[in-house]
Structure formats: structure tokens, C-alpha cells
Amino acid sequence: MGRKIKDFFKLNIVKGDIGLWMIYFLLCMVSIVTIYSASSQLTFKSERHWEPMVSQVGFLVVGFIIAVVLSKVPCKYFKLIPVVGLPLAFCLLVYVLVASKGVNDASRWISLFGISFQPSEIAKTMLIMAVAVVLSKLQKEEKIKTKKGTKIVVRATKGGYKKAFTIVGLLTFLICGAIAPENFSTAFMLFTVIVIMMFIGNVPVKLMMKGLTVLLVVRALFVTALLVLPVSTLQNFRRAATWKHRIEQKIGLEDVDKDSQKYKDDTRQVNMSKVAIASSNITGVGVGNSVTRDFLPHAESDFIYSIIIEETGVAGAVVVLLLFVMLLIRVGRVAQKCDRFFPAFLVVGLGLMMVMQAMVNMSVAVGLIPVTGQTLPLISHGGTSIILTSFNFGLILSVSRYAEGVVDKKGKAAKKIIEDEDTLLETDEIYSNVGMA
């Protein structure tokens, strides 16, 4: 079986790390099987039994083509993408704040030429790529002498970290600030990924702590304003009234009417998700035998992990979790192989974003954190998420192909040195024998 898989990759159809491709294919397979089972409500709305399934497979095929094409593009050209992509993404985010249409009670979507998509998905990738470019220019290698010999260390260029922090901070503020009004969870995750990238990129912790302190002060003032201002005033500011309602409920300032329709709607998803998990009885009810899918809102997207647990039990839950853990591990190995900073920062940022989104989705499904609306990458139903996740996979696979080339070159160079040394030893031995004669 393993040999057949290697033979498939030798067909030159796909390029890059085999492990990453296997994770990609397995996630797609889980998506197809689960969407077929979980999309009963979509099927009822469309009145066509196969429509949700066909659309999902169609998006996965398009995503696969994008991943294949990008995996064959040299990663050095990716630096050019955010030059155009980031300003475009910011403009789309501003547009969605002004003239967007609501989907699932959240105005996060825009429609262009009959295609609906979320600009925040594009903005995530563009910002990570831009930050990778900035941080890569900050790094430099220095040779230092130690007792064990010469050691190469990576440090920030003199004074460069302040410039990098300013640029990255400004870009992050603009993009996350534009995303937050309609999708706070995405803005928070993206901000967290950028902070981790800056930490890896040798930006001084003291400088980052100063920035975080300022943000915490702004956050405290913002929350205070939400609590003090009346609802009638906040209704003029998009979802501010909703945030006020949730904060007051969380800290116990607002009495919750459990008989109200709003309370029932807010808790229905969480309760039905718990019912789905409890119905699994550890071993699962079997693929396609879910009962909760007909009653759980957004079972095919936000709460698809609950359906996976219900049908496949603990085993299915662990397998999906391990796939994303393995993705993060493989991405880390690819970054370690890179001899240039930009591709290393790029794969780390994209990998962290995908895995963090998956962890948030799964945490919501099992009731660890409040509902966020985050989908499960490559598995949940949705075209924008699948296409852009595949785009990110393509970028990572291109870097993995570059990293493998670096390792091969180092291996060939080392082999040549060994061969040269063997030749010299043989020559010395010949001269030695001649001298002895």
C-alpha cells in the first residue's frame, strides 16, 4: 500500500511533502462522507437530495486543482501576492462593513458576480503573507565562536525590530480592526497568530508587551463603554448591542429570561450539540445514522464535529483531532528544513491559522468555549473556506517542495565532500605505498 502511494506521487501530478498531501486527502474524504450525512437540512431547503453533496465535491475538486498548481510554483514568487492582495482584502473588508448581506445572522459576506464569499478569509492569508515578508527582512545570521566551535545564530538586524514591529502592528491593527466588528473570533485568532510569528521572528518580548498593554487598555475602555452606553445608542454601531448583551449575561449583570425566544435560540445549538455527542455512546451510531443532524442548526458547518462524534464516536473524534495535530507537526518540520526566512515564516503562520481555527471549531462543538461561527477547515460545508484553505495548502506544499530541494542539495554537497575526502585518502595511500616501495 505504501509503495502504491509513493508510485502515485511519482506520476508528477502532485509536488511537495507526501505527509501533507495525505493529510489533505484524508480531510477531504472526511468532508465528503460527513457532508453527505450532515446536510439533511440543506437538502430539505434545496429540495434536491444530491445538491449539497455535489457542491461540496465541486469545491473540493477546484480546491485540489488550486493546491496542485500552487505546489508547482516556486515559493519565491509568493512575496508578490500580498502587495496586491492585502490592499484588495482591506478594501473588501471595508465594503462588507458598509454594504454587506447577512448570512446566518452575521453580515460577514459580500456578493460579486453572483458569488458570495467572506473577505475575512482572504484577509487572513494576505496578512500572514505580508507579515512573513516583513519578518524575513528583519533576520540575519551571525557566526559566533564557542568552546565547541563556530555556531550560527539568527538575530534581528540592528534597529530593524522597531521598524518591523511598527509595520506589522499597523497592518495587524487595520486588518483585525476591519474584521472584528462582524467576526471578532477570526480577528482574535489572526491577532494571536501574528503575535506568535513576531515572537518566532525575534521581535523583543518587551516591545510586544508594550503593544499588548496598550491593546488591553483599549479593550478595557471598549468593554466599559459597552456596559455604560444604553442599547438604543449601541444599535447604531453594527453588532455592539449584541456584544453588550453577551457580556452582561457572561458576568451576570443581566437577568436571563429562560422562557424567552432569544434565550432558546442562543442555547439551542449548544444543547443539540451536546445531545449529538451524548448519543454517540462512545462507539458512535454509524456513518449516515445521525438523528441530531435534523435538529442541530448548521450541522453541516459550525457543528459538523458534533455529527462526526455522534456517528463515529471517540475514534472519529480522535482521528480528526490527530490530523490537525499532524498538520502542525509536518508544517514545523518543513519550516526547519528551509534555509530562507520568508518560506519558514509563511508555513508557520498558515499552519498555525488552520490548526487554531480547527481547535476553536472543535472546542465549540464539545462546549468548551462559546459559539464563534468558525468552520472546520476542509471538512465543513462552504466554498470560500474550502477554496482558501486549499490555497493555503498549496502555498505550504510549494514551500515543502523547496525545503526538500534544500535538503537534497545539502545531501549532495555532503556526499561530494565525502567522495572527495575518500579520493584524497586513496591518493595518500598510493603515495605512501610508493614511498615504502
Model-derived segments and spans:
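Membrane-helix boundary/helix-loop-helix interface segments in multi-pass membrane proteins
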Residues: 2-22, 26-27, 33-181, 362-375, ...
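Hydrophobic alpha-helical transmembrane segments
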Residues: 58-66, 311-328
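Hydrophobic alpha-helical segments of polytopic membrane proteins
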Residues: 61, 83-90, 164-177, 184-235
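Hydrophobic, glycine- and aromatic-enriched re-entrant/interface helices and adjoining loop segments
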Residues: 103, 107-109, 212-316, 341-343
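Alpha-helical transmembrane segments of multi-pass membrane proteins, especially transporters
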Residues: 159, 163, 167, 211, ...
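Interfacial segments of multi-pass membrane proteins
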Residues: 188, 193-207, 291-316, 374-387
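Membrane-proximal intracellular helices of multi-pass ion channels
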Residues: 226-227, 314, 318-321, 330-343, ...
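Loop-to-helix entry and N-terminal half of a specific, functionally important transmembrane alpha helix
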Residues: 332-373, 379
